[in-house]
């Protein structure tokens, strides 16, 4: 069964997991965070954002190191791509998820900004001890982050690498393993160039 993009749902161990944690371009940064904070909770007609919540949002935004703590009342649509991606990551983790699914979450960013967002991602995942699945075509990121690397080709798992083997893996090694396992050459410049 296929769902429209905005309604796509993944089922993992009988959990329904929305495919995205989107922000509204027309809401303020703090309003987007408030909606994410209340996800899965009973909603009331109380004021939307309490002072204590606003201070908690400011503290969490300060930790990102992108100056967003001073942009609580800026509309999300006015933020840079990296700021928006970091905001979305924070929104997705305000309520600790059982599984954080990151699908090409740095693909639309320039290399410098992607590196910053990956550093923020790594810090949040480690500090919050989040089980995370990251989908990427970036070979360097696939090797650098996480405990396990699973590679797909034509819808099938062709590699499953972890432990010491993953720690010692290089992009060249990974390409060679891909060629041997799949019987074809890797053809994505984006994956090679990172």
Per-region residue spans from a language model:
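Conserved beta-strand-loop-alpha-helix hinge in the C-terminal portion
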Residues: 156-182
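Conserved catalytic motifs of ABC-family nucleotide-binding domains
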Residues: 96
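ABC ATPase C-loop
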Residues: 92-93
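Q-loop/switch helix immediately C-terminal to the Walker
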Residues: 27-41
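Helical segment within the ABC ATPase nucleotide-binding domain
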Residues: 114-128
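Catalytic Walker B motif of ABC-type/P-loop ATPase nucleotide-binding domains
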Residues: 100-103
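H-loop/switch region of ABC-family ATPase nucleotide-binding domains
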Residues: 136-137
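ABC-family nucleotide-binding domains
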Residues: 110
């Amino acid at each position: 069964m296929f769902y429209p993009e905005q309604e796509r749902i993944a089922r993992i161990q009988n959990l329904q997991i929305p495919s995205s944690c989107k922000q509204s371009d027309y809401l303020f940064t703090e309003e987007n965070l408030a909606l994410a904070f209340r996800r899965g909770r009973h909603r009331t007609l109380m004021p939307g954002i309490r002072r204590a919540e606003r201070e908690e949002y400011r503290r969490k935004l300060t930790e990102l190191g992108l100056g967003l703590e001073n942009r609580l009342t800026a509309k999300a649509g006015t933020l840079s791509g990296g700021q928006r991606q970091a905001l979305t990551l924070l929104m997705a983790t305000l309520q600790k998820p059982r599984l954080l699914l990151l699908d090409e979450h740095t693909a639309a960013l320039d290399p410098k900004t992607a590196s910053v967002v990956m550093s923020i991602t790594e810090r949040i995942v480690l500090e919050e001890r989040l089980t995370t699945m990251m989908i990427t075509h970036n070979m360097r990121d696939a090797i650098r982050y996480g405990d396990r690397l699973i590679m797909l080709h034509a819808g099938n798992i062709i590699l499953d690498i972890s432990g010491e083997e993953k720690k010692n893996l290089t992009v060249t090694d990974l390409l060679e393993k891909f060629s041997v396992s799949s019987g074809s050459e890797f053809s994505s410049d984006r994956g090679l160039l990172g």
